[in-house]
Every structure is written in C-alpha cells, then in structure tokens.
C-alpha cells in the first residue's frame, strides 16, 4: 500500500477513534475536551486542535436532537402555541424553550469575545495538560459537594429562571478545557436542588445551541482552508461521535435513575492525578 494512502487511512482511523471518545465523554461529567487532549498525547499522536475537537462535537449535538426529538418537538410546539403575551408561559415545556435560550447566552457571548479578542487562546497554557489536570480535580470536588448539599427534589415543572441563569453562567466555564460542559451544568443543577435525571436532561438540552453553533463555526472555518479529501476524516469523526453519543446519553440517563454521580467524582480525581504524576 502506498505510504500516502496508508497515512490517510490512519488519519481516518484516528478520526473514528477520537469521535468515539468525543461522543462517549461529551455527556458524562468528565470533559470530552480533556480526553481529546490527553488520549492523543498518550498514543503519541499530534494534537488535532480546537477546530477538529469543536467540529466533531456536531455529531454529539445531532445525537441530542435525535435522542430527545419528541421532547424537543413538544417544547417548540408548546412555546409557539401556548404563549400568551399577557399571561406568560402556561406550561413547563413552553418555559423550557425560554430557559434553553437564556442558558445559552453567556457561553455564546463569552465564546465570541474569546474568538475576537483572544485569537491565540487555543495555544495558551489553559489548554495545557497541567491546567486540565487541576481543573479536573476541582470540578470533581464541586460535583461531590453538589451531591452532598443538593436537595434533588425539583422536577422540570419546578425549575425557575434563577436556576437557569445560574446554570447558564456555569455553562460558560466550559470554555476552559477540562471543566466539562455537561459536568458543570449538572453540578449547577444539583446545587439548585434539581433531581438527578432531570438535571441531566436539562444539561443535555441547554447544550444544544452552544455545541451546535461552536461546531458549525469551526467546521465552516475548516471548509475554507481544507480540501474535500482533508474534510472527509472530520466528517467520519462527526458520524462516529453521533453513534457513540447516542449510546452515552442512554447509558447515563439509565445510570442516574438508580445511582449518584460519585463514580465520576472518583474518576475525575484519578484522571487529574494521573495527568499530574504521569504526563
């Protein structure tokens, strides 16, 4: 096999593998960005960069929309059919449309500001392994505290605007590698007293705009500079991410029906310590 073909097939293999990693870790509170940084390092692969990582998140975004398609359809229909300007939102689904919008504002605004005023952010020390390790440990401790002090008695109908504003601000912290978007939003929701499975579903739903927009922006930027043959591995990564995301969403929701999140606390502590002591 010619060397160029062999190299290209290996790039496609890496895209499939990293797509699986992305999809599986995007919805668990363990940070997909951190794993997409650490795993290539362990295998001696080149860091594929922020654009690749953000682009393959599109597979995860499509997976959320597909998995929750019935709920999302209900949310949209409720918003446009039951909203009365004089009375406000009548039911939880129409309010949830507003909540998703509100929770998305901080991360989109801060993300845009970073894009405009910190062009070298992707090469900063914040994306280094040491920063990721420390962040992983800190986020593990916060998740543990949310399990200890969160009352976990709120369902969707009980969620209010204050809960969502706090969750949206927390989600903006996910711009820093190692934080975990699903992890920090789940932690915020638990601190607000939201029941675990409801907290996870809310975390997934509010992530749709941010993950989708981020992925589309980076993918379009790659389309402008890469050839079709170079784009194919990214598309493969997106598809791989989609299927592993579906599996991860279903697995995590079933897990939270009967368990707490402490196993992820232990994992993140071990992950952070492993990076500090090994890499």
Swiss-Prot record:
Bilayer-crossing regions: 10-30, 48-68, 96-116, 128-148, 203-223, 229-249, 259-279
Gene: uppP
Family: Belongs to the UppP family.
InterPro entries: UppP (IPR003824)
Keywords from the UniProt entry: Antibiotic resistance, Cell inner membrane, Cell membrane, Cell shape, Cell wall biogenesis/degradation, Hydrolase, Membrane, Peptidoglycan synthesis, Transmembrane, Transmembrane helix
Superkingdom field: Bacteria
Localization: Cell inner membrane
The protein's role, per its UniProt record: Catalyzes the dephosphorylation of undecaprenyl diphosphate (UPP). Confers resistance to bacitracin.
Taxonomic lineage of the native organism: Bacteria, Bacillati, Cyanobacteriota, Cyanophyceae, Synechococcales
GO CC, one annotated term: plasma membrane
The protein's name in its UniProt record: Undecaprenyl-diphosphatase
Lipid bilayer topology: Multi-pass membrane protein
Biological process according to GO: cell wall organization; peptidoglycan biosynthetic process; regulation of cell shape; response to antibiotic
Other known facts: Bacitracin is thought to be involved in the inhibition of peptidoglycan synthesis by sequestering undecaprenyl diphosphate, thereby reducing the pool of lipid carrier available.
EC code(s) of this entry: 3.6.1.27
Alphabetical list of Pfam families matching this protein: BacA (PF02673)
Reactions catalysed according to its record: di-trans,octa-cis-undecaprenyl diphosphate + H2O = di-trans,octa-cis-undecaprenyl phosphate + phosphate + H(+)
NCBIfam families, sorted: PRK00281.2-5, undec_PP_bacA
GO molecular function per UniProt: undecaprenyl-diphosphatase activity
Chief place where the protein resides: membrane
């Amino acid at each position: 096999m010619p060397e160029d073909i062999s190299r290209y097939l290996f790039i496609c293999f890496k895209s499939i593998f990293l797509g699986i990693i992305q999809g599986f870790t995007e919805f668990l509170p363990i940070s997909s960005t951190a794993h997409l940084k650490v795993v290539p390092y362990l295998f001696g692969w080149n860091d594929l960069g922020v654009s690749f990582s953000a682009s393959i998140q599109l597979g995860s975004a499509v997976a959320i929309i597909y998995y929750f398609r019935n709920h999302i359809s209900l949310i949209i229909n409720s918003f446009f059919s039951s909203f009365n300007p004089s009375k406000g939102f009548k039911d939880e689904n129409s309010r949830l449309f507003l909540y998703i919008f509100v929770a998305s504002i901080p991360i989109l605004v801060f993300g845009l500001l970073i894009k405009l005023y910190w062009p070298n952010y992707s090469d900063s020390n914040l994306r280094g392994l040491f920063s990721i390790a420390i962040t992983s440990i800190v986020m593990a401790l916060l998740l543990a505290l949310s399990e200890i002090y969160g009352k976990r008695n709120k369902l969707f109908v009980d969620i209010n605007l204050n809960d969502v504003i706090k969750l949206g601000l927390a989600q903006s912290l996910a711009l820093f590698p190692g934080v975990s978007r699903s992890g920090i939003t789940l932690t915020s929701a638990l601190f607000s007293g939201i029941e675990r499975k409801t907290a996870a579903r809310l975390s997934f739903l509010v992530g749709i705009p941010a993950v989708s927009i981020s992925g589309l922006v980076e993918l379009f930027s790659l389309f402008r500079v890469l050839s079709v043959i170079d784009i194919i591995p990214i598309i493969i990564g997106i598809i791989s991410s989609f299927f592993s995301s579906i599996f991860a969403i279903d697995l995590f929701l079933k897990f939270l029906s009967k368990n707490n999140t402490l196993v992820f606390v232990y994992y993140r502590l071990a992950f952070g310590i492993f990076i500090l002591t090994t890499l």
